[in-house]
Amino acid sequence: MNSKSNTQAMETEKIPRLLARLAIPAVVAQIINLLYNIVDRIYIGHIPGVGAAALTGVGLFTPILMLINACAMLAGSGGAPRAAISMGKKDNKTAEKILGNCFVILLLMAVALTVLFFAFAPQLLTLFGASDQTLPYGVDYARIYILGSIFVLIVMGMNPFITTQGFAKISMMTTVIGAVINIILDPIFIFVFNLGVKGAALATVLSQAVGAIWILRFLSGKKTILHLRKENFKLQKEILLPCLALGISTFVMLSTESILSISFTSSLSRYGGDLAVGAMTIITSVSQLATLPLQGICQGGQPIMSYNFGAGNRDRVKKAFFTQFTACTVFTGCFWLIMLLFPKGFAGIFSNNTELITYTAWALRIYMAGIFSLGFQVACQQSFMALGQAKVSLLLACLRKLILLIPLIFILPHFIQNKVFAVFLAEPISDILAAAITTATFFHRFHKILNRK
């Protein structure tokens, strides 16, 4: 589909069909993107003799990984909606300035993060709960991954600009190409070359590098609507700051995910040791099977809402939201049921250690008890972003994790005898409370936002 027909589709195509056309590739891309981490952990968990310790050590790198992702999405999730709104106003020149400024800030963040995390990886992993047994595996994985973080930032930060132009399939191919390469290289580097966790990290970095090249070639080519141009690489405060202001909510969500991961691993290390931390490593991967497809659905809905909001098409904004809302809630409802029925099957994917599988299955049922409500929160919070409501989106991004979940992780063990159970129970309580508050806030403000336009 060419750029003109993409623009016409945003204005005229039936919303359910348009959302499906944009969201399905985005969901597939998110699931495939998840394979970067899941495939690593599956292979690492099955390294003979050291699988459980290696898996736990690599899992302790999660907070750093999430912070790198957060920095990428600061530019991507903030810049892409701003670009879409400008496109809706037929102002592609400003949209291209947004693209160029976001690209440069991604490069600057890559340099800063590489220097910081490479130097302090051992100290940070120890702070997160690494033991003498698991620390070497975490450091080996972290340092190689960190050296390739520039590719991660380009892939995650620039890909939303492809989706927001209506090129969902091109966006999906970014992650498909990288994931396929990662799946092929992982067993070769880990087992054939006997590189262990270093091989897993190297495979991930190389696959992300290919994805970054793919994105840059597309955004510099003829098919894209918005082009990367050198003249737009000069940072402009009036262009960049509104993007970062809008993206800060996603940045906070992912950054608090990092703080949350530290809170979980440090508490579980204290109350349950390496076994509990290993279970949390698996749970983190399984939970992404819910959160990443939700993000994919919202990535499909975001350009529709943003474009039509910019164009003043209120009815299409409403239809896009309610279609997205329904898709998110149906998905999380189904996921909740599957988790309650088959937790052991999911745990067994990541390890052949019977004790770890049994422990993780028990923890999964507790942790996932409120996952059905997550669709409400994500659909509403992401819709605030699509409509340019940065402050409200930021507050709601903080609500679930920073205001509710993290305090509960430390408070509940003081009131419940089984300390590990108390730590896991904090998750469903915060899920349900945050969903109720976010949904009520959105429906209270939605019509007011549309009527102000």
Feature roles, as predicted:
Residues 1-23, 83-150, 194-247, 305-370, ...:
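Short alpha-helical transmembrane segments in multi-pass integral membrane proteins
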Residues 55-115, 152-171, 279-337, 341-343, ...:
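Small-residue-rich hydrophobic transmembrane alpha-helices
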Residues 26, 30, 42, 81, ...:
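Transmembrane alpha-helix boundary and packing residues in multipass membrane permease domains
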Residues 21-40, 144, 178, 207-211, ...:
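Transmembrane helical elements of multi-pass membrane transporters/channels
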Residues 52-63, 138, 142, 201, ...:
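Small-residue hotspots at the loop-to-helix junctions and early N-terminal turns
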Residues 11-50, 63-78, 82, 107-114, ...:
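N-terminal transmembrane alpha-helices
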